[in-house]
Amino acid sequence: MIMAFVNMGLCGDNESIYTLMRLVGPDKAELMMMTGDAYKGEQCVKTGLATVLAEDGKLAETTYALAAKLAAKSSTAHASQKRLIRKYFYGDMEKFAKDEGMEIAANSRQPDFTEAVNAFIEKRMPVYNQK
């Protein structure tokens, strides 16, 4: 997993900051968002970004086993649990999404974003001059 928005001169998008803060805490989320470093599967499980890690070559087997386990449980209970988790864990996401959209719009008008796009097109690393 890579939080690569910073590599394009942008803040996070699609509520990624909001979700990361809740999964790994604000300090780790800030580091991930600011560095754009890649995290492998094992790191994702250790930090709480993923819940299941499939062994090499066993993705389908692991997925089907989890699906079968979930299918054997009460779908009514699952629906209630999902509703409650989303309501109370992500309750203020709508306001966050609006704020995030305003920040991304502001970022996209900055020289850093233009430099990132040009660097991508020219297949080179961006050089940011903005302080």
Where do the model's predicted regions map?
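Low-complexity, intrinsically disordered Gly/Pro/Thr-rich segments
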Residues: 104, 115-117
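Crotonase-fold acyl-CoA enzyme core
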Residues: 1-76, 110, 115
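Conserved N-box asparagine in the HATPase_c
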Residues: 123
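C-terminal long alpha-helix characteristic of the crotonase
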Residues: 50-98, 102, 106, 127-131
